[in-house]
Amino acid sequence: MTIRTLLDAGADNAVALTAPDRPAMTYAALRQHVDSIGRQLAGSGLGPSDRVAIVMPNGPEMASAFMAVAAYMSAAPLNPAYKESEYAFYLEDLAPKLVIVEAGSENPVRAAASALSIPVVEAVVGDNDPAGAFRLFEAEADATPAGADNEALVLHTSGTTSRPKVVPLIQRNIMASARNIATSLELTDSDHCLNIMPLFHIHGLIAVLATSMSKGASVCCTGGFNALKFLDQARDEKISWYSGVPTMHQAILLRAKRQADAAKGLGLRLIRSSSASLPPAVFEELNDVFKCPVIEAYGMTEAAHQMTSNPLGDGKQKAGFVGIATSPEVCIMDQESIRLNGDAEGEVCIRGENVTPG
């Protein structure tokens, strides 16, 4: 299985991507778009595992750009808010062969790429295009989707304790993680997620986007998290779930207190939390306000996101608990790489199909 075959899960006329005030993109249109972008990139001389940096704002075009590049080459999404010096570091470290930017953007990545002689191409959205549609080049060439062992996504660790490290993830890593998360959340093609996570981060890319696509489900791609708009967006889109970090959940709860009517009757099937520890008080309040399971999960970039998760069933979630392993093997080891008992203190070690080959 690869990212390109993952996209075959959705029925032709099923909705894949939506965005506020935009026509929806169906799975048939998404597959055509992904294949067209693959041919356009091939026409510029790129092939499987070649890295393509993507610097675009959150939204449907960023989502489809990731899926298209990862299906045929290797996607290297970067934070569109970086400074030129930061782009210079990441571009030099990643050595992409191309940078994709939003049409008309004056992002400083242009100058950083120019200094490194890396070509930049604009993603041009046509009038009345559905959410996620854009074009890069006029010329196209035959293109072969990436294989299971080709690099699909490359990100950096946060670098909070040392120099950020490159984390390459291959196609089978992404597929395994999407499958594991979809299973733990019991996703189906009737689910609709509101994405509020940045799409240059493993959480949004895998837990929301790739996982939904693997089940033929749909994703509403907002321009980014806005607590003032969240409840209205959730109601208008009739979403069944969302995934966020604790600070987002806290901001949503603050709005829910001020907009009690808007918070009622959303009918959420679940709320997922990851990327930081969810305070027990926030866990309880989310349960109380939205009347649905709150699923806290534990993940890291090197594991293509999720390693453990709370079970979905009623009453099976525990506050302050990251859950049980969701397919990868997880254990605690000491500095000599000897396994320890579960109540011992040591390093968390993982092994599985979703773990980066390094």
Task: Give residue ranges: language-model regions.
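Adenylate-forming
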Residues: 57, 101-108, 223-226, 239-285, ...
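Conserved AMP-binding/adenylate-forming
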Residues: 39-82, 94, 217, 271, 278-295, 302-358
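Conserved AMP-binding/adenylation subdomain of ANL enzymes
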Residues: 175-192, 202-240, 255-258
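Conserved AMP-binding A3 loop
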Residues: 26-28, 152-179
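ANL superfamily adenylate-forming
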Residues: 104-149, 255-258
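Conserved pre-ATP/AMP-binding loop-to-beta segment of ANL
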Residues: 12-13, 127, 138-156, 162-163, ...
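AMP-dependent adenylate-forming
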Residues: 4-26
